[in-house]
Amino acid sequence: MLKFQTVRGGLRLLGVRRSSTAPVASPNVRRLEYKPIKKVMVANRGEIAIRVFRACTELGIRTVAVYSEQDTGQMHRQKADEAYLIGRGLAPVQAYLHIPDIIKVAKENGVDAVHPGYGFLSERADFAQACQDAGVRFIGPSPEVVRKMGDKVEARAIAIAAGVPVVPGTNSPINSLHEAHEFSNTYGFPIIFKAAYGGGGRGMRVVHSYEELEENYTRAYSEALAAFGNGALFVEKFIEKPRHIEVQILGDQYGNILHLYERDCSIQRRHQKVVEIAPATHLDPQLRSRLTSDSVKLAKQVGYENAGTVEFLVDKHGKHYFIEVNSRLQVEHTVTEEITDVDLVHAQIHVSEGRSLPDLGLRQENIRINGCAIQCRVTTEDPARSFQPDTGRIEVFRSGEGMGIRLDNASAFQGAVISPHYDSLLVKVIAHGKDHPTAATKMSRALAEFRVRGVKTNIPFLQNVLNNQQFLAGIVDTQFIDENPELFQLRPAQNRAQKLLHYLGHVMVNGPTTPIPVKVSPSPVDPIVPVVPIGPPPAGFRDILLREGPEGFARAVRNHQGLLLMDTTFRDAHQSLLATRVRTHDLKKIAPYVAHNFNNLFSIENWGGATFDVAMRFLYECPWRRLQELRELIPNIPFQMLLRGANAVGYTNYPDNVVFKFCEVAKENGMDVFRIFDSLNYLPNMLLGMEAAGSAGGVVEAAISYTGDVADPSRTKYSLEYYMGLAEELVRAGTHILCIKDMAGLLKPAACTMLVSSLRDRFPDLPLHIHTHDTSGSGVAAMLACAQAGADVVDVAVDSMSGMTSQPSMGALVACTKGTPLDTEVPLERVFDYSEYWEGARGLYAAFDCTATMKSGNSDVYENEIPGGQYTNLHFQAHSMGLGSKFKEVKKAYVEANQMLGDLIKVTPSSKIVGDLAQFMVQNGLSRAEAEAQAEELSFPRSVVEFLQGYIGIPHGGFPEPFRSKVLKDLPRIEGRPGASLPPLNLKELEKDLIDRHGEEVTPEDVLSAAMYPDVFAQFKDFTATFGPLDSLNTRLFLQGPKIAEEFEVELERGKTLHIKALAVSDLNRAGQRQVFFELNGQLRSILVKDTQAMKEMHFHPKALKDVKGQIGAPMPGKVIDVKVAAGAKVVKGQPLCVLSAMKMETVVTSPMEGTIRKVHVTKDMTLEGDDLILEIE
């Protein structure tokens, strides 16, 4: 008996009680014996197999699965009551096409009926016949109908006989390329090749010209042969921009045929459906009537039974053309089920048992459209790379569910392996709503809930489709995707949690990602962050700057009573003591406290210099992001950066437009004071930097680099007159503030008094700023002398980050001036709390701390004049190479090298040049005299040669002769400012290159980072693409990773906190990987990490290097089915090189350039991973 329920104005079939009573048939139709089905085998895999199993279970029918050797881990074999292996030793697809094995399983296991699903053998008449011959029912049309409908040429003839309009095309499969030529001569282009024995987009190619004909014919034939076992093709006229409408039909064995209305499958890519809609929106009722009546008429013409689909193209004039009949269940049958409340699989089974449609309560007048349904096929394809299939292991799978959402899936679960052997479909998501916009909203919400990690998916693309106004309006055709390129403006998933786990796992397996100079673990104690009051910080000098501009700011500084301080803790202090390794994570922690308690600072030095490239190179963080985040936390204190004149923040010369743009963007991101210097005090370089900073609206602070001793009358090269003359030039050029940059700490109190008082007398209204290092130990005394001589600002570092090669102690300066006219008005007790935090933070960076090898400063700096940061580096390098006892020789060589080069101003990059020459002399056992005597024969460091060529400017007093001429010989020399001859850099072109290289949104900041440090930036972007931003990790985890069983929290952003526990690390597998297990927010996660040390001993196929022109990599994982070139062959751009097959789709890899094949790294039948090197072109 039947049970029905009234649903939204229609009747819903709830179920059929299985009995032995005969079905009701028309009086004029022969009554058939009712034969209940007790066991069904699905000759298919994946989600369609599971869909049928579920229907069978609901009907009390036992289920049988078949699976290939490659599918042993797939879910469909677990969802059945029984599962059997087929196609042993066969290729993955061939296993499911092997009829003898399938029939054997059916007969040996008492199977009553076989459901073919879709694809594979579902439209093979010989399979339907084989089932019938074996006494097993085929759940589908009769073999004869399958044959007729599967042969698209015969189906076309039947349609014509039935009076159904068809597209002009061949009457039978073509046997040669010549026939395709003849057809195109008759009907013109475009034309389309179609597989004669299957669908789903396989073996389908559109051709627009004679030039494309041969290649597309070959590819279509090959795809059809691979997918359906028969490469036969037919060709027809291609209807441009049609709607693709298909009508669901259902017939029984008594001649009853009905339709279940239509579906719009117009949203396609390469003739494969991506999104399906039921019913078709804005479809004229008369056209709907013609489509459905023609479908029923065609089905009756051929005596159709069971479920099927009649497909049509509808042109822009509303004229419809028959395409084909799919004599099987369609992938998109789900949307019809949702809007009609008819379970099509139930109906298929009941019809195969001998029931009639009226038995099932299915009459045309009872079929009503209820609402709208949309199906999205979520696939493991990368839309950003032309939908290339992705393979790999699903690390995370979380689906979107809720009211109005149906999911049909198979092996979509954490740990599932997506292979290249089969279709890329992961899950079908079906949304049902009262109308099209409602269904689209539900679908969009569901897709937004999905989390799939480990493989790429097309979800971002689907979300763009769902948000497209044309789609929401329901106006779509088969060119929808091609005509809406904005659909490919994909917003990349953040994937922050999984990327963090990948990073932590990588560190646990391979050790720190940043080089660790000393094997010392970070302190286990977190630094104590002092309490910060609630509310905005008090006003500071930045408020004056924003209100009155650079000139007003300079006046306020000059008119201020008392000594002003610049805090270098955020930059130069950790550059000098901790190898510039302090992370933004630790700077941000203390930043609010500084804003609230040190608002009367002149500025905070927190950017520029070495921090820029070290941030990317070793800390894997964006220096611009550091600036932005600190600006948000410290809105009231001016920020100051170190700008290397025409070198900006790099070590070489850049085109002028790069320097100007850099300053402009730095100002936009929150930089205030630009302290501009040149390593040689070369005025043209400094003037360029000043002009760039000034035009950006920044405070221009020209810095004169100090060396020598103005108080020593025997030191005549860098005399008081030299500095005063340089100051005159800089003031004339419009500097707002004048700075003396004493990078080696050479200013003695007497020299301070002489130099500063002279500058104050000469420039009474100009703010004076003094920067020094405390290597000699006299820094506090020197800064007090400067203040007493008229300096407005001196540099200090908080106590626990001061001294040695860093700046003088903040607390000492504050205490020494307290109660005097120079009182800094900085609360001393606040300095204590600030220092306590940095004492704890410094412990986190123990592996980089200079005190690992250097226990104190040294007054010999007055002799060797080594800058603070470089003194630390040279000291460490000597000890790390076992030359600690020879550091004295290094310092002596530094002095000699300096004199050989003409007694230079020594600050980056000139200090590095002197250091390189010194180390060269020590390593080669050369004295100054020997080096000078052998200058013509020796191969000096590149930095030395380029300096002598004039690459960084002209030193005071000129180049040393004859040493320069001996070294350079015939090498070219640069006259004047080095950057003046450089052509402007095309920043727009660079931006385009970066987008092509990294495949994501590129900011103006990224462009400038790449302009300054192209290689470092590229490595940084590649690193973060794999591991994501790491600023949320604490420094201990960043450097050494977690210990097993360690639990910790990571705050991604306000209100989003991850709870993580490290569980275990597995043994090495055959691929050179270790599996690392975590618990994330209570759920088990695991990732595979390559063991870099172990992989050095294993052989793997080489990868194509993206930055090496001519290295062609596999665009996707797959199998090589054809190699079209050999070594030595000449190729042109666009020429096919090889053909890959993956997920039953073929991809032709073409040459991106003209050249000669240097080497081919693949052979036919080789299986490749993504980016595996295919060949090299030169």
Curated annotation (Swiss-Prot):
It comes from Rattus norvegicus. InterPro entries: Aldolase_TIM, ATP-grasp, ATP_grasp_subdomain_1, BC-like_N, Biotin_BS, Biotin_carboxylation_dom, Biotin_COase_C, Biotin_lipoyl. This is Pyruvate carboxylase, mitochondrial. GO terms for molecular function: ATP binding; biotin binding; identical protein binding; metal ion binding; pyruvate carboxylase activity. This enzyme performs an important anaplerotic function in replenishing citric acid cycle intermediates that exit the mitochondrion for consumption in various pathways. The modification N6-carboxylysine is found at K741. The lineage of its organism: Eukaryota, Metazoa, Chordata, Craniata, Vertebrata. Residues 1109-1178 form the Biotinyl-binding domain. The modification N6-biotinyllysine is found at K1144. Substrate binds at R571, D572, A573, H574, Q575, R644, T908. Homotetramer. Interacts (via the biotin carboxylation domain) with SIRT4. Its cofactor is biotin; Mn(2+).
